[in-house]
Amino acid sequence: MDSLFLLQFACFIFMLINAIFVALSHLYVRWVNKRYERSRWMVVFAMIGLAIQYVVQMAFGFRAADDILGAVVNILIYTPCFSLIGMAIYNIETTRANRRKMNLVCGAINAATFLVFLVGISLHHSLYIKEGLYIMLVLFCMSVSYSIFMIVREMIRRKKMLETMAATDMLPYLRYSRASVFILCFSFLTMPVVIFSTTLLFIIGPLVLLALLFFNLTFIALGSTYIPTEELLDKEEENNDLVRTGYRYGGGIFCQAA
C-alpha cells in the first residue's frame, strides 16, 4: 500500500467525518433557520462530493497512473464541490435576490466544465483531453474568483448592517467570514498548481484539509449562535430590497446572543 493511496484514504475519511459532523450539528441548534439549513446541506453535499472524488481516485488509480489523469478527475469534481461551498456561504450572507444570479452563474460554469470534458473525450477518445484540461482549469478559477468577489461584497454590506443595527457580539460571524474567504482564496491560489503535481499534493494537501476543518468548525459555531429575534433585522433589510427589486425571498441573521 503506497503513500499516495494512504493519503487519499485519509482524505476520504476526513471528508466523510466532516460531512457527518456538519449534518449532525443540526440536532444541537437552539433555533432552526431555513436559510442556514439550506447552506448546511450544501456544505454536507460538497464534503460528500469531495469524499467520492477520493474513492474514485483510489478505485481507478487515476492519480497513481498519471498526474494529468488525476488533474482531470480533480477539476471535474472540485468545480461543483467548491461552487456548492461558495453558494452556501453566499446564501447566508445575502438577503437579496442576487442568490439567484449567483446560482445561475455557478451552474453555468459547472455545465461548461462538464461540456468541455465531454467534448475533450469525444475528440481524443481518452481522458487525456489536452487543451480541454486547461480550459477546465480556467473555468474552475473563474468559479472560485467569482464566488470570492460576490461573497466579499456581501460580507462588507452585512457587517455594516450588523454594526449599525445589532447590539450583539460579532465575533462568531467575523470568524466565520474570515474562514470562508480564506478557504476560497487558498483554494484559488493552490489548486491550479497542486493538482498537476503529486509531490506538491503531499505538502499542500494537509494544509487544505486544515483550512476546510476550520471553516466547518466556524460554520457550525455560527449556526449555534443564531437567535430568532435577530431575524427582524434581515426582514427590515428584505423589505427595503423588495421595494428596489420586486423579488421575494426569506432570510435570517446569525449573531451571538448578548
Where are these regions (language model features)?
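Extracellular-loop-to-transmembrane junctions of the mid-late helices
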Residues: 2-15, 115-153, 191-205
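Hydrophobic alpha-helical transmembrane segments of multi-pass membrane proteins
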Residues: 10-29, 38-63, 75-83, 109-120, ...
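Membrane-water interface of transmembrane alpha-helices
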Residues: 19-25, 81, 145-159
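Membrane-interface helix-boundary motifs at transmembrane edges
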Residues: 27-42, 65-67, 90-103, 126-129, ...
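Hydrophobic alpha-helical transmembrane segments and immediately flanking/interface helices
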Residues: 77-84, 197-222
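The cytoplasmic-loop to transmembrane-helix boundary for the fourth helix
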Residues: 90-120, 131-140, 166-183
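Alpha-helical transmembrane segments and their immediate juxtamembrane interface regions
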Residues: 90-99, 208-234
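Membrane-proximal linker segments that couple transmembrane helices to downstream signaling/catalytic modules
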Residues: 218-258
